Amino acid sequence: LWLPDGQPRLMLQISHGMTEHSGRYDTLAAALAEHGIACAAFDLRGHGRNPGSRTCADMGPDGWEQSLSDLQRFCERLRESFPGVPLGMLGFSLGSFLLRDALCRGMAAPAGVILAGTGTQPGAVLAVIQAIVRGQLRRAKPGGTTPLVQKLSFGAYNRKFAPNRTRADWLCADKEALDRYCADPLCRPDISAALFLELLSAMRRTGGKRALAGWNRCPILLLSGADDPVGAMGSGVRQLGAAMERAGLPVQTVLLPGARHDIFHEEAGGAAAQARSRILCFCETILAESEKPRNQSPAEK
């Protein structure tokens, strides 16, 4: 929990990405706290300080559904602890798909949403990968992975930046930040076959235009690196933004030039600073919208 001096103007709940942990958002949260914005985060199941393998991120049996419940309960506690303070939500990478799934189900009802490092892929492509991963799941140990699963997940992203210096070059071009990530004992190097399959399922559920029908009508920011393979080097993010616009959702789409996936740690080139600035500006948008009278007509807004 990161609190500003005095009463928070906004609470921003943060859901972190695959294989990492909530502590990696300290710089972002501290910067927002200087402007009266509180931040709160927790380690997702099988991540960070939670029990489980230290080499393979795995949420356990029914882990995705349990994680959605965790997110719902966490938001409820934040609302109880900070009554009257608008609640915004930020999801990065894995966290963005978890948040999107929650919103598709009408959960959380945030005052504003930030989806960072997200994207969309054709359902047919995801279905093929799912079928392959199901076969690999039978070969993998419980909570474990296989070489093919790694090749289909992180390996596919890393190949776009060959020749590779590390297993995670796709995350960012900032070598110092990348080395800190690889050396962080709370960051798992691999993803389990089971978690990858659950992620693929969530991507299919949240990718169709019908999925947007249940979303809360609140300000939305899509924020990604222009060179992020998860967002298909920007095209997948733009497609998602266009789909949201067609669904009548108030969305802003921002692609940071030269930045890869992990925009919050891409300090070299200034992408991380730009990301913090964009999020701060968007938080002001959330606050402005939340202060409007609820009985205002669309024309008056």
Set out the residue ranges of the language-model regions.
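Alpha/beta-hydrolase fold nucleophile elbow
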Residues: F82-S93
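Conserved alpha/beta-hydrolase "acid-adjacent" motif
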Residues: P229-Q239
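Active-site glycine-rich loops that stabilize anionic/oxyanionic intermediates
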Residues: H16-E20, S93, A226-D227
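Alpha/beta-hydrolase-fold enzymes
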Residues: L99-L186
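Conserved alpha/beta-hydrolase
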Residues: A29-R54
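Short beta-strand/loop motif that positions the catalytic acidic residue
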Residues: L222-S224
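Alpha/beta-hydrolase active-site loop
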Residues: G60-R79
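Catalytic active-site module of serine/aspartate enzymes centered on a nucleophile-bearing elbow/loop
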Residues: A247-K301
